[in-house]
Regions:
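Well-ordered, non-membrane alpha-helical segments in soluble/globular domains
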Residues: 32-37, 176-177, 192-196
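C-terminal helical/tail subdomains of lipid-metabolizing enzymes
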Residues: 123-136, 141, 146-154, 158-164, ...
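Active-site gating loop/helix substructures
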Residues: 2-147, 167-170, 299, 327
Length: 338
């Protein structure tokens, strides 16, 4: 009996040890990278990526707590790995994607010396994990003017739908996973606030503005977006050149900011914005979009395969939300005039 008990305890200890240290003995990221390469990227390297659009893949470099960005232009991260240290031409796309998604159960990804410009130089290999740990929305490199990837205007798609709950909290592995989900959710919200809810001078010129159309697939497709847009004008979150493009004049905007607008006047502003963004046209497919939203919100951002109906739902919802948000927040990018 004692032997059986000891054997069981030893077995539990070994299994627990391997679970905690599985990356040391079982490099899961290498295996997944090989599958990525075989089934998706077919031995393509960064030099095979198109010149336009410029594709940038983010990973978090653990030792520097900074983003390492992979692209056809360069692979760089902070002062330890400036442009030219790592050569992008031969780095597999599969390695870049694996580094960008190495979370939470995959082992960290390293870039070996064979990809360095000087293979004999004593440079520590970067240790990479999911880029979302540092930059959950992929906005960091886009809104920096000195960045090689900086843009004046951007469309951000957030497909996250994680709902935090207390299920499985007694399990230490599940607990750690939920802690990471909480952290990434917090980063996501902070970046969204910076992109959408940062007060500005209404008179800012388009050339000096860095505007973002933020598309959150889990937002309910409804008229609430129009009301929220007016609230943003009220809180000085929308510059003049944007709201004027959607039919709101300066007098109306000032009354919104001063909180002196009557309900009837606000209703009229609502109708003006609707006319300029072609709300009636968007409503033609709204029932189909609501059905797509109901299906899409249950699609997880994990490695589980998607059904064709789920893919179609995501496409339908993303298209509708993108058209709406671009018409509201980036109207000057649309060539056709109402």
């Amino acid at each position: 009996m004692c032997i059986k008990i000891y054997s069981t305890l030893i077995g539990v200890f070994v299994v627990g040890y391997l679970l905690i240290n599985h990356n040391k003995y079982f490099c899961s990221s290498k295996i997944v990278e090989r599958y990525y390469n075989k089934y998706f990227f077919e031995n393509k390297t960064l030099k095979d990526l198109p010149d336009t659009p410029l594709i940038a893949i983010n990973a978090t470099e653990v030792t520097q707590n900074q983003l390492m960005t992979f692209s056809k232009l360069k692979v760089a991260c902070g002062s330890n790995y400036p442009q030219g240290i790592i050569l992008p031409d031969e780095i597999p796309v599969s390695l870049s994607v694996m580094a960008s998604s190495a979370y939470p159960l995959f082992s960290p990804v390293t870039i070996s010396a064979e990809y360095f410009a000087d293979t004999k130089k004593d440079v520590e290999e970067p240790v990479l994990i999911d880029g979302g740990i540092y930059d959950n929305q992929g906005l960091h490199k886009l809104d920096e003017r000195k960045s090689a990837y900086g843009t004046d205007f951007s469309i951000v798609s957030n497909a996250g739908n994680a709902e935090l709950n207390d299920e499985g909290m007694e399990n230490v592995i599940t607990l750690l996973y939920k802690v990471m989900e909480l952290l990434m959710n917090r980063i996501e919200k902070m970046q969204m606030r910076k992109a959408l809810y940062q007060p500005m001078e209404p008179q800012i010129e388009m050339e000096k503005d860095k505007r973002c159309a933020y598309v959150a697939l889990m937002w309910t497709p409804s008229e609430r977006a129009i009301d929220g847009y007016l609230n943003n004008i009220q809180d000085s979150l929308v510059p003049r050149y944007v709201y004027e493009a959607n039919g709101i004049n300066e007098e109306q905007a000032e009354r919104l900011r001063q909180r002196t607008m009557t309900q009837e006047e606000r209703r009229q502003c609502n109708e003006i914005v609707k006319e300029h963004i072609k709300w009636a046209e968007l409503c033609e497919n709204q029932n189909r979009v609501i059905e797509a939203w109901a299906r899409a919100k249950n699609v997880g951002t994990n490695l589980k395969g998607l059904k064709k109906t789920e893919i179609n739902a995501l496409v339908t919802l993303a298209e509708w939300q993108t058209i709406l948000q671009v018409r509201l927040h980036l109207p000057h990018l649309i060539h056709e005039q109402v």
